[in-house]
Amino acid sequence: MQMKILMCSVPDGSLSNTLKPLLPRGNHYQVPIQPVGILRLMTWIEKKGYSSDIYDINNLRPSDEELIENFKRTKPTVVGLSATLSHCYPNVKRISKILRKLFPNIWIVLGVI
């Protein structure tokens, strides 16, 4: 069975309210951050012969329904969650619960990239 690796950037959920508004995200604003660390890791993964994809949750800010739809469509076997700050924990927990409910045997890897 081929691994389907999905790399996800996790939103912090609290610092965005204190930053200068640049991009509207519902009732708050978020400065767009490019997931450079994730992209570098994906390059390494692909050099090792695996395929990977990215889901930029931090900048897209999808609803739970949109998360579920994306995860069902991509059907990952491994998900990497990049959480850059401790403020990300509530979203890490929320996303992990959604993944575990959809795919009980999925590997969820958490890192700071």
Name what the model sees in each region.
Residues M1-I113:
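A short, structured N-terminal alpha-helical element that caps or precedes a catalytic domain
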